[in-house]
Amino acid sequence: MKRTVQTVVVLIVCALTPVAWTAEPGNDEAITKSDVARAFKPEFSPYAGRNYPTRVFFGDTHLHTAISVDAGTLNRVGQEDAFRFARGEEVTATGGLRAKLSRPLDFLVISDHAEMYGLMPQLLSGDPEVLATATGKKWYEALKSGNHDRIFATAMEIVGSLSGDAPPIKSEKAVRNAWTAYTALADKYNEPGRFTALIGFEWTAIGGFNLHRNVIFRGDARVANRTVPYSQYDSKNPEDLWRYLAEFEKQTGAEVLAIPHNGNLSNGRMFTVETFAGKPLTKEIAALRARFERLVEVTQIKGDGEAHPMLSPNDEFAGYELWDKSNLNGTEAKKPEMLQWEYAREALKTGLALGKKLGVNPYKFGMVGSTDSHTSMSTAEEDNFFGKHSGVEPEPHRWEHVVIEAPDPKFTIKGWQQAASGYAAVWATENTREAIFDAMQRKETYATTGPRMTVRFFGGWDFNNDDTLSRLPASVGYTKGVPMGGDLPAASGVKKAPSFLVAAMKDPYSGNLDRIQIVKGWMDKNDKTNEKVYDVVWSGGRKAGPNGKLPAVGNTVDVKNATWENSIGSPELIGTWTDPDFDPAQPAFYYARVIEIPTPRWTAYEAKRFGVTMSADVPMTTQERAYTSPIWYTP
């Protein structure tokens, strides 16, 4: 019996320490109490044995270059310059301005449109493969005519062809050539440890209703070249896209994901409870979506998609950078009943209900931001914003230029309505394709509207205020809980409410932090979904008023000079929070939202630089923010 006990001790010690030692043969007393104490003594170095992500990497999963048909009608900056720009090099924009990021990005996905992939450079260069078609010859002659009106009309015709049932110019060879040239370029600029060039493309379906997805490959050119971009000419049905991705994974053994964007412009079509054909959603379709769409792009140039004030009337921060008048191209007006199926927070709530009904939650997604820039330049900083496309690059009057023209003028989008947003933040173990992709798969990500603030969010059952005293909150977070994107494990022992550890540090180039909030969504016993926003930690000595709301942090922005003072707010915030309204029988999700103090919007910088006066309806200040991926609780 004595020998058995000692053997167990040896096994436990060997399992918990890198030091391997055993008892001497025939000597039952070889392991002493001091030996055991030494084995269980904490390492001297607090970093020894650490294998969790310690760095957040910032990038753009949604950038278009001259290779995209719509971008290429105006943009003359190619994919190579897009990679160079993201890596921190200076490039020349289409309009002739020099451009450079304040800091390099860590990763980039050039997601040019699958539809007629690579057509525009081939068309403009007079590629024989393209000019051999009647449409190609007609477009080439028009674009080279020197007649501005004819060129513009042809450009609009080309852009409109993206929504057709068949490509006006069909050349599989041309698409294949453009695709393999791109994947080779991505491999060239991919530099493990310094810069990650993920390979991807955009599937662009349903015209003005924006059911678009960015498809991202985990592997290199050898993997990606086993296919060509799947386009809306192959199918306009996102369910067919998921089946294509499933077949690709089956045939190659590789991994791929899809990120939908701009649900805010889908007019109620993005996050529905029906199939594409309008039938009740099935478990099979829900499982396909959950498998491939683990992330959603919630903020970008074409508006913010986290929440809407009509859906969240008690949320004073829900009205951020709204594009909510119509669908993408202004051909259908927005109706209030459409909003429920467009915004991320509401979709997360819908997912709770579908999870109970189907046994699969198709809307169990994490969050990222990206730009959707069509200039080949990933610019999301307010003072360095080059616009949606090359027709609205910086110049004195771009604030009033048309970005998207609609049949009804009241739905036309003007330059000032663009949001200088956003970026994807990824907690990965290293800056490589594999590590970045794997972090996206596990949803350990957050969205920012541009600033590169550092945000941590953990959920568990035992976090307390002592955990905020460490300068290594992640060590506590991973030990006692799960990170953003995770699922709360079952509580052990006494019934208790979940607790959360949240921390944020400001971007040194941006404003101080106003507050950190936790957004909770849950489904009650009557299967009704609900939400509530809790202020968890904030700057200054503010106290909640009778309505439970904190007073505003203040505003130091000098609009005339496009400056602000970091004399309010905090450079960092950290806190713990325990859900005061928890019911263990109710499924729920929680995510953190970090709000900055007011700072100048890009329009204020523009007015100052060019000495122009903009109309009174143009906003001049902004409160930048970050949204983490949720943490889910399932009874």
Where are these regions (language model features)?
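Aromatic- and acidic-residue-enriched carbohydrate-binding clefts of CAZyme catalytic domains
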Residues: 134-165
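C-terminal functional module detector
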Residues: 23-79, 83-140, 168-171, 181-193, ...
